Swiss-Prot record:
The gene is plsX. The lineage of its organism: Bacteria, Pseudomonadati, Pseudomonadota, Gammaproteobacteria, Alteromonadales. This is Phosphate acyltransferase. HAMAP family: PlsX. Gene3D superfamilies: Isopropylmalate Dehydrogenase. GO terms for cellular component: cytoplasm. Catalyzes the reversible formation of acyl-phosphate (acyl-PO(4)) from acyl-[acyl-carrier-protein] (acyl-ACP). This enzyme utilizes acyl-ACP as fatty acyl donor, but not acyl-CoA. Disulfide bonds: none annotated. Its EC number is 2.3.1.274.
Length: 342
């Protein structure tokens, strides 16, 4: 099996090396062909490495830097002034071919700006998109993109997002001809703005994308569609609203189960089942948003991710690297454009 290398921004996120380093060690146990480069303050990183000798340590490399992109840094400032930051160096390792993927829990805007400048977009792709999984009633994840990388998109960009989302679903979940839809205010052909309508018309004539039409917001979690495409403004609000509703449901459920002696007694009896249901709704299980459409792989973790959640982001990056996701997107787009122009 070919060895893979992940470049990890060890200082990113709310918890820094306290979370990123132990998660990296766990990833090495799961992926025997994986190597990880930890970028950040060497002294801080070494505090969280195993003290006893471990064979896995031979697959860890540390690149020392004390500069960090903060959550308060504006993207343009980070791009111009944080040239020795752990985030930038991790991305440069991907650009220079020393790592197959970069993982960071740091400033999202800065990561997207740096990634686009350093890694460049694939031929035929105008803008990268941020995509992540959402839980669905079927038990299988649903991909939603864009989640905020592009607050406004024309029809061509939405078309490109549909291609990239379809390929990502095929690569990570090995789903043959995943169902792709555009998020809209109605399912009728006359509904929606010009950009969405025009993107739908293009996709209807693209045989290599299994486009099924428009879906409304209440269809997102049914699992009837595998990939849902929208601009970043709509996608980000949808994602944040969904996370808020999930928190509300958990809060109300816990509150209701503490309401009275008999209810508390019943809750103890059904606690394992309730825990299983809540576990499926836990955003940590879906941690890791991919910035796709670039010449390299970039995965963004939630800033407040714990060790288990950050491990999910590392697993996602390793899977995308094994599947050679950028090459798959490039080849699919070339094939589609060839069909359109023939």
């Amino acid at each position: 099996m070919t060895n893979l290398t992940l470049a990890l921004d060890a200082m990113g996120g709310d918890h820094g090396p306290h979370v990123t380093v132990p998660a990296a060690m766990q990833a090495l146990k799961f992926h025997t062909s994986l190597n990880i480069i930890l970028v950040g303050d060497k002294t801080e990183i070494e505090k969280y490495l195993p003290q006893a000798h471990s064979a896995d340590l031979s697959r860890i490399e540390i690149i020392h830097t004390t500069e960090v992109v903060t959550m308060c840094d504006r993207p343009i400032h980070a791009l111009r002034s944080r040239k020795n930051s752990s985030m930038r160096i991790a991305l440069e390792l991907v650009r220079d071919g020393k790592a197959e993927a970069c993982v960071s829990a740091g400033n999202t805007g800065a990561l997207m700006a740096m990634a686009k400048v350093l890694l460049k977009t694939l031929p035929g792709i105008d803008r990268p998109a941020l995509v992540s999984c959402l839980p669905a009633m079927t038990g299988k994840p649903v991909y939603l993109l864009d989640l905020g990388a592009n607050v406004s998109c024309d029809s061509e960009t939405l078309f490109q997002f549909a291609i990239m989302g379809s390929v990502l679903c095929e690569a990570v979940h090995k789903k043959s001809r995943p169902k792709v839809a555009l998020l809209n205010v109605g399912i009728e052909a006359i509904k929606g703005n010009d950009q969405v309508q025009q993107a739908g018309q293009i996709l209807q004539h693209t045989e290599q994308v299994n486009y099924i039409g428009f879906v409304e917001g209440d269809e997102i979690y049914t699992g009837n569609v595998d990939v849902i495409v929208c601009d970043g403004f709509v996608g980000n609000i949808t994602l944040k609203t969904s996370e808020g509703i999930a928190k509300l449901l958990v809060h109300q459920l816990k509150r209701g189960l503490n309401d009275g002696f008999f209810v508390r007694l019943l809750s103890k009896l059904i606690a394992p089942r309730i825990q299983a249901v809540l576990s499926k709704m836990n955003p940590d299980h879906y941690n890791g948003a991919s910035l796709i459409g670039l010449r390299g792989i970039v995965v963004k973790s939630h800033g407040n991710a714990d060790e288990a959640a950050f491990l999910q982001a590392l697993n996602l990056a390793a899977t995308e690297a094994k599947r050679r996701l950028p090459e798959m997107i490039k080849d699919r787009l070339e094939s589609i454009l060839l069909d359109i122009n023939s």
